[in-house]
From Swiss-Prot:
Cofactor binding summary note: Binds 1 Mg(2+) ion per subunit. May bind a second metal ion at a regulatory site, or after substrate binding.
Protein name: Ribonuclease H
Quaternary state and interactors: Monomer.
Functional summary from the UniProt entry: Endonuclease that specifically degrades the RNA of RNA-DNA hybrids.
EC number(s) per entry: 3.1.26.4
Positions that bind Mg(2+) 2: D19, D143
Biological process (GO), any one: DNA replication, removal of RNA primer
Length: 166
C-alpha cells in the first residue's frame, strides 16, 4: 500500500489491557492480555513457574506487543506501576548506565526489560496506568486471564492463547 506524498498511512488503533499474577512471589505465575481494535478482541494468556509478579506484568505487555505483526498505534493500559514507571522513565537511565540502576546495581528482570524495549519497535505507543482491582472492566478481565495462566502453569502448561494478529 502506498500513500501520496504528504499523506500519512493510517495505523490501526489498538487498546491493550494487561495484568500479571503470581501465587507466592516467587511461585507459579501468569499473565493476561486483551487486544482490542475496532469491534475485534483477542485474549492472550500464559504462565511460568517459578516466576514473580513483576516478571508476569512485563510478560503481559511483551506478549501483547509481540502478537502485533505490523506497526500500530497502541494504548497500553496497565495497573503495574513497575511496568509503567519503568518504561516511561527508569529505562532511559538504565540504558545510559549500562543496565545498572542509579545505585549502580544490576537492573532486575533486565532480560524482559530489553525484550520489552525491542517489542516497542515501530509501534506508536502511549501508556495509561489504571488502578488495579477497582472495577475497571478490562483490567479485571486481564486479571482473570493472568489467574488462568497461573493455574495452567501449575499444571505444566506455558501458553494458553498465543498467536500473531493484525
Amino acid at each position: 500500500m502506498s500513500a501520496a506524498a504528504g499523506d500519512e498511512i493510517k495505523r490501526v488503533r489498538v487498546d491493550m489491557f494487561t495484568d500479571g499474577a503470581c501465587s507466592g512471589n516467587p511461585g507459579p505465575g501468569g499473565w493476561g492480555t486483551i487486544l482490542r481494535w475496532g469491534d475485534t478482541e483477542k485474549e492472550l494468556w500464559g504462565g511460568e513457574t517459578p516466576t514473580t509478579n513483576n516478571r508476569m506484568e512485563l510478560m503481559a505487555v511483551i506478549r501483547g506487543l509481540e502478537a502485533l505483526r505490523r506497526p500500530v498505534t497502541v494504548t497500553i493500559h496497565t495497573d503495574s506501576r513497575y511496568v509503567h514507571d519503568g518504561i516511561t522513565g527508569w529505562i532511559h537511565g538504565w540504558k545510559r548506565n549500562g543496565w545498572k540502576t542509579a545505585a549502580k546495581k544490576p537492573v532486575k528482570n533486565e532480560d524482559l526489560w530489553r525484550r520489552l524495549d525491542a517489542a516497542l519497535g515501530t509501534h506508536d505507543i502511549s501508556w495509561q496506568w489504571v488502578r488495579g482491582h477497582s472495577g475497571h472492566v478490562e483490567n479485571e478481565r486481564a486479571d482473570e486471564l493472568a489467574r488462568r495462566g497461573t493455574s495452567e502453569a501449575r499444571q505444566g502448561k506455558v501458553d494458553g492463547q498465543s498467536s500473531t494478529i493484525l
